Amino acid sequence: MKCPFCGYSESKVVDSRSTEDNMAIRRRRECLECSKRYTTYEKVEDIPILVIKKDSSREFFDKSKVINGLIKSCEKRPVSRQQIEDIASDVEKSISNQMVTEVKSDAIGEMVMEKLKEIDEIAYVRFASVYRQFKDINTFMEEILNLVNKK
């Protein structure tokens, strides 16, 4: 691995440990030429997952899109950035664990909503209103009533 500071290709590992989620190994390295330290991560290469959109087009799963949707839904709500990232990671992990190469966008939306419902109901309703594309106030109210009745 090349040193990001001087480009030298040899280094020694100073420290090595698993990340919190045990999905990668964090290595602290020291360049043998300039002695500067830097961090690398080693993880299993993921199989790319294709998302089948509502119009039947396909695109690669992008965790940042899930995070951005959650950020909009959780705006001005007591939901931390870490909780948002945890939801996105849980959804990504759940899809990977299914060992599929394609997943419908509907399934992703449902997974996000289930996780969001546990954390903040207002953010859940906001996400659902965009995801489910409510046509009028009645369908919006039905969703809220379903949420209230499930308590």
From Swiss-Prot:
Belongs to the NrdR family. Residues 49-139 form the ATP-cone domain. The keyword Signal does not apply. A zinc finger (unnamed) spans 3-34. GO terms for biological process: negative regulation of DNA-templated transcription. This is Transcriptional repressor NrdR. It comes from the Bacteria. Its cofactor is Zn(2+). One of its GO terms (molecular function) is ATP binding. Binds 1 zinc ion. Negatively regulates transcription of bacterial ribonucleotide reductase nrd genes and operons by binding to NrdR-boxes. Keywords: ATP-binding, DNA-binding, Metal-binding, Nucleotide-binding, Repressor, Transcription, Transcription regulation, Zinc, Zinc-finger. InterPro entries: ATP-cone_dom, NrdR-like_N, RNR_NrdR-like.
